[in-house]
């Protein structure tokens, strides 16, 4: 499965700025992975990784603004859409897909947003996919 997701926030803002500031790199070791590299990496995984029953579980221990999490959820949701037509089943499987993805970050604003350079955090970006 080769997927290129539409991540306008990531593509427009973060692709140009892989580093928010020298201070954040120094203090947090923070550097962002562009979505095209995320997709290249995820394309190396077998297709069964995207099934939702039983779901593969993913943990991103340095999730930043969620580029990996968004791409993983997008692939899982595409699998759901292509394997069931029933809206109620799709909804249940979409929630199962979301529940199988975990992200942690040292910086609360990466998760929650609210910084002038980072208004939308990983949490809201993930939830907007549903």
What residue spans do the PLM features occupy?
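SAM-dependent methyltransferase catalytic region
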Residues: 1-130
């Amino acid at each position: 499965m080769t997927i290129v997701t539409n991540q306008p926030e990531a593509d427009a803002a973060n692709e140009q700025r892989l580093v928010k500031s020298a201070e954040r790199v120094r203090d947090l070791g923070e550097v962002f992975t562009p979505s095209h590299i995320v997709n290249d990496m995820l394309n190396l995984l077998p297709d069964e990784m995207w099934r939702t029953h039983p779901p593969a579980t993913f943990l991103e221990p340095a999730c930043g603004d969620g580029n990996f999490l968004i791409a993983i959820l997008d692939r899982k949701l595409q699998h759901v859409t292509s394997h069931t037509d029933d809206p109620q089943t799709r909804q249940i499987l979409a929630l199962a897909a979301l529940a199988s993805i975990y992200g942690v970050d040292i910086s609360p604003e990466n998760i929650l947003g609210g910084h002038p350079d980072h208004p939308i955090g990983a949490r809201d970006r993930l939830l907007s996919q549903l």
